[in-house]
Each structure stands twice: as C-alpha cells, then as structure tokens.
From Swiss-Prot:
Task performed by this protein: Required for maturation of 30S ribosomal subunits.
Cellular localisation: Cytoplasm
Protein name: Ribosome maturation factor RimP
One record GO biological process: ribosomal small subunit assembly
Family: Belongs to the RimP family.
Keyword entries, A-Z: Cytoplasm, Ribosome biogenesis
InterPro entries registered for this protein in UniProt: Ribosome_maturation_RimP, RimP_C, RimP_C_sf, RimP_N, RimP_N_sf
Cellular component GO terms held in the UniProt record: cytosol
Gene name in the database record: rimP
Length: 157
C-alpha cells in the first residue's frame, strides 16, 4: 500500500525546512469543491515571512515534481499557521505554556469536552489549563492522550 500524501510531503519538506532553520507545523491535503489543496504550514521562533514561504514553496514544488505522489492537479500553499496555530506535538504544548489555548477532548473531563484558558503546564502526559468557571478560575488537568485537538486562542479585549 502506498504512503499517504501527507507522509510523503513531510519526508520531502523536512530537509528543506531544516536547511532554512524552519519547522513544520502541519500538512493538510484536502478537496474543497472541485479542487485539491496541499497546504503546508511552517513556522520558526521568529515567525515566517512571505519570502520564506515562497522559497519553501519553490523547493517543495521541485521535489513534488520529481516524486509525483499526487496523480491529479492540486494547489500547493505554503504559509504560516497564523495566530491560532494548532498544537500538534508535545513540543508545541511546551512552547505554548503561558499562552491562551483552546482544547477539545475525545471524552468529557469534569463534564466538559471543550476548554479555553491559559496553558499553565505540560509534563508530557498531562496538559494543565486554567479556565474561567463563572467568576473564579480553576485548573483542569487533561490527560495528553485525551486531547483531540488543540490550538492557540486569540483573546479580543
């Protein structure tokens, strides 16, 4: 059985990003309407700019043309993950400590499956978030394996 497109793209883009001191955040391969999109989200400690996205796009496009893992036409998009960056890997959670996050879980924890608040800790097995409970704050400890999805959350004042 052939590898998933996202796995192949990850193998192709990782050395490109390493050479540019960038990191891979996520890869999406989706059909929207009649069109297929291959989206590669990149970042660094200093953020990314349009020139870096363009360079990665050019280099990755060359590699994709060589390997040709996608049998039909598609649009390649390389961009920053934006302000509400997904938290996919353990190191993403560690880097997000002290920031506002939005987390969905596979099953209820203390009667809830969605949490928004400040990420105050992550030890590799437990994600600790301070959430607002009516007029006070409380800490919720979420087992890492129960996190279905997580992202940074922007607070508007």
């Amino acid at each position: 059985m052939s590898k998933k497109v996202t796995n192949i793209v990850e193998e192709l883009v990782t050395p490109i990003l390493a050479d540019m001191d960038l990191e891979l955040v996520d890869i999406e391969y989706v059909k929207e309407g009649k069109n297929w999109f291959l989206r590669v989200f990149i970042d660094s400690d200093n953020g990314v700019d349009i020139e870096q996205c363009g360079m990665v796009s050019e280099k990755l496009s060359e590699k994709l043309d060589e390997v040709d893992p996608i049998p039909h036409n598609y649009f390649l998009e390389v961009s920053s993950p934006g302000a509400e960056r997904p938290l996919k890997k353990p190191k993403d959670f560690t880097k997000a400590i002290g920031k506002n996050v939005y987390i969905k879980t596979y099953e209820p924890i203390e009667g809830e499956k969605e949490f928004e608040g400040e990420l105050i800790g992550f030890d590799g097995t437990t994600v600790s978030v301070t959430v607002k409970d009516k007029t006070r704050k409380k800490t919720i400890d979420i087992p890492y394996e129960k996190v279905a999805s997580a992202r940074l959350a922007v607070i508007f004042f």
